[in-house]
């Protein structure tokens, strides 16, 4: 449980500090649960510019260079009927990148093998309950 946006961001920084490239972070949660704050932390852990990370709801996908390139997708505006496939997310993150996907429940499929699922929930006031699960398996399994 985090009690401030800065703590949620710090969780992201600690997670990504050990990334080596090819990781995918899928973020789930209602509006205002801290998904973008978590991605800012990922950027900080990757030595990218966290202040440049905003919710890319209108752009859908942005990239931030750092130790590894952070590709940040926000699927909020997508309907979830396969229109995510047109973004080319399956080609990302590549060996020198990390892909973070907000509103990951709108993905039509999860083709990646090294995935961190981050679930954020309101826990009253500024508190957030954050669950992180890592799974590494063959794509499409």
Feature map (PLM): residue ranges:
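N-terminal pre-Walker A segment at the start of P-loop NTPase domains
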Residues: 1-14
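Short phosphate-coordinating micro-motif centered on Lys-Gly-acidic
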Residues: 80-141
């Amino acid at each position: 449980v985090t009690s401030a946006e800065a703590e949620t961001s710090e969780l992201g920084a600690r997670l990504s500090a050990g990334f080596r490239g090819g990781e995918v972070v899928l973020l789930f949660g209602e509006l205002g649960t801290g998904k973008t704050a978590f991605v800012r932390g990922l950027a900080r852990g990757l030595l990218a510019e966290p202040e440049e990370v905003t919710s890319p709801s209108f752009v859908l996908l942005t990239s931030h260079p750092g130790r590894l390139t952070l590709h940040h997708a926000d699927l909020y505006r997508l309907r979830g009927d396969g229109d995510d496939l047109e973004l080319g997310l399956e080609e990302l993150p590549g060996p020198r990148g990390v892909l973070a996907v907000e509103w990951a429940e709108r993905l039509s499929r999860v083709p990646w093998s090294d995935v961190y699922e981050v679930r954020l929930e309101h826990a009253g006031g500024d508190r957030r309950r954050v669950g992180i699960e890592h799974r590494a398996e063959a794509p499409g399994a």
